[in-house]
């Protein structure tokens, strides 16, 4: 069984990303359960989607992922990654965009909301978790997505090591071209798949996009996926 939590801000397409992920899993014959929690505002509020996939033929009875059990958290915004972090299981994978969406309250706060600080705090938190579990000597936390990231999450003495994959989404948007900011959700799914962290192929992800996305937006989303896969090498 694979449990993936997707987190973002209203309007980023978190629910659509969950739908695409579920479609790709269902096309393989897996049982899938999904659920969403949506903030007060349709746009600007936090949105969390739960996707539970029976990748080994398991029956799934509850659509909700409990804290500390998610195999992967995919966040479309670093602040939402921090909010969703308690759901990550030991040895889990955190994939997050590094560009912040500034809430209205940030303008009123004495301390500015800096995406870089949040990303650094996430890395430090996962490093501390690895240390607490007496796992690996250091966490794999590159500044950008690369093709040669260590695929192992086995620490010394068998303790699982969390993996942090911060994604330079601004660079991916430039690579994919105009309009691709709207496809950030598909970019992050593609990164997770291309890194081998989700047992799906890129082609299966693309087929799910064709099945779930409105026809006029398919080409844009496929281009975003291609840009993300190319960035991963």
Language-model-derived ranges and their functions:
Residues 1-233:
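Active-site cofactor/cluster-binding pocket
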């Amino acid at each position: 069984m694979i449990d993936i939590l997707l987190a973002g801000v209203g309007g980023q397409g978190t629910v659509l990303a969950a739908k695409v992920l579920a479609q790709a899993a269902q096309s393989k014959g897996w049982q899938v359960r999904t659920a969403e929690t949506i903030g007060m505002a349709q746009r600007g509020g936090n949105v969390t989607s739960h996707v539970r996939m029976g990748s080994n033929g398991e029956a799934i009875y509850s659509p909700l992922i409990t804290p500390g059990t998610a195999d992967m958290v995919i966040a479309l915004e670093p602040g939402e990654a921090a909010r969703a972090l308690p759901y990550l299981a030991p040895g889990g994978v955190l994939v997050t965009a590094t560009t912040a969406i500034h809430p209205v309250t940030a303008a009123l706060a004495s301390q500015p909301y800096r995406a870089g600080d949040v990303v650094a705090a996430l890395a430090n938190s996962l490093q501390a978790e690895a240390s607490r579990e007496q796992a690996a000597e250091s966490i794999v936390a590159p500044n950008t997505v690369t093709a040669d990231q260590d695929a192992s999450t086995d620490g010394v003495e068998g303790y699982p090591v969390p993996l942090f994959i911060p994604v330079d989404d601004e660079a991916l948007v430039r690579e994919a071209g105009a309009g691709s900011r709207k496809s950030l959700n598909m970019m992050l799914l593609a990164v997770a798949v291309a890194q081998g962290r989700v047992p799906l192929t890129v082609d299966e992800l693309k087929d799910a996009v064709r099945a779930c996305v409105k026809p006029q937006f398919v080409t844009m989303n496929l281009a975003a996926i291609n840009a993300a896969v190319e960035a991963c090498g």
